[in-house]
Amino acid sequence: MKRIILDIQSGLYARTIQRMLLQELEEYHIIISESPSKTVERCKMFRPYALLMEVTGYTPWMLEEQLAIREAVARNNPDCKVVMLVDDAADKALAESVKQAKRDGLIDAFLFGSVTEQYMAAVMDSL
């Protein structure tokens, strides 16, 4: 069974994504990290296939902070795929920075908040 860790700002949004992924993907275990400060610990414990991290303009979900978490996760689990979720409608500059992180090879994929549930699940399944 593959595991995905969610590092999402809103607990309600995290649970919504969790339920959606469980409906769309078979044989996956979706685990919510309560806060970015616990994400590295969760990744050590569960050794996920992928980490889906939200990026916002607010600490502790800022791009630089999430990239630091990504680096710590990679030291312990170099095979873990990292996907960043950004609200492209709310912050176009941040969305462009996340795209640049993908171009630079710092993350494996990115998703805009406006994607469909099926597309999000397909991306997570295809890493």
Model regions: which residues?
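Non-catalytic signal-transmission and effector/linker regions of two-component phosphorelay proteins
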Residues: 1-19, 115-127
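Two-component/phosphorelay signaling modules centered on CheY-like receiver
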Residues: 11-33
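Short, aromatic/basic amphipathic alpha-helical patches
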Residues: 17-21, 68-69, 94-103
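Acidic, metal-coordinating helix/loop segments flanking the phosphotransfer/catalytic sites
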Residues: 34-50, 58-60
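Conserved phosphotransfer microenvironments
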Residues: 51-75, 86-89, 94-97
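His-Asp phosphorelay/catalytic-motif detector in bacterial-type signaling
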Residues: 75-81
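Output/docking surface of receiver
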Residues: 86-127
